[in-house]
């Protein structure tokens, strides 16, 4: 009986404490090579946990797909990068997530690597706005 109560309490704790896949505010650094500057902007992206499991053995009937928290819907916004030369295109377009879900990572539109450059990577000096 105690093990049943423990399992019930553990499941309740997990449901309350562990955040599911949801929209979250993040700051990313954007840069344009022609401009030589970086700026930090606030945007919305997906973060959280998705239920997944690894099979101990390979089963051809059931492929092993790791689910990740990723966007379901997104829109694009544009910002002007200051300090660009007059002949350079100073507009930078970036994605903003509007809806999230747990799904297989789509490497055509998402960086699915374990360790990418990160949202604050900048090759140039940063302009504080």
Swiss-Prot record:
GO terms for biological process: follicle-stimulating hormone signaling pathway; G protein-coupled receptor signaling pathway; positive regulation of bone resorption; positive regulation of gene expression; positive regulation of steroid biosynthetic process; regulation of osteoclast differentiation; regulation of signaling receptor activity; Sertoli cell proliferation. It comes from the Eukaryota. Glycans are attached at residues 25, 42. Disulfide bonds join 21-69, 35-84, 38-122, 46-100, 50-102, 105-112. Its main location: secreted. InterPro entries: Cystine-knot_cytokine, Glyco_hormone_CN, Gonadotropin_bsu, Gonadotropin_bsu_CS. GO terms for molecular function: follicle-stimulating hormone activity. It is found in: Secreted. Keywords: Disulfide bond, Glycoprotein, Hormone, Secreted, Signal. Residues 1-20 form the signal peptide. GO terms for cellular component: cytoplasm; extracellular space; follicle-stimulating hormone complex. The keyword Signal applies. The keyword Glycoprotein applies. PROSITE patterns: GLYCO_HORMONE_BETA_1 (PS00261), GLYCO_HORMONE_BETA_2 (PS00689). Together with the alpha chain CGA constitutes follitropin, the follicle-stimulating hormone, and provides its biological specificity to the hormone heterodimer. Binds FSHR, a G protein-coupled receptor, on target cells to activate downstream signaling pathways. Follitropin is involved in follicle development and spermatogenesis in reproductive organs. Heterodimer. The active follitropin is a heterodimer composed of an alpha chain/CGA shared with other hormones and a unique beta chain/FSHB shown here. PANTHER family: FOLLITROPIN SUBUNIT BETA, GLYCOPROTEIN HORMONE BETA CHAIN. Belongs to the glycoprotein hormones subunit beta family. This is Follitropin subunit beta. It comes from Bos taurus (Bovine).
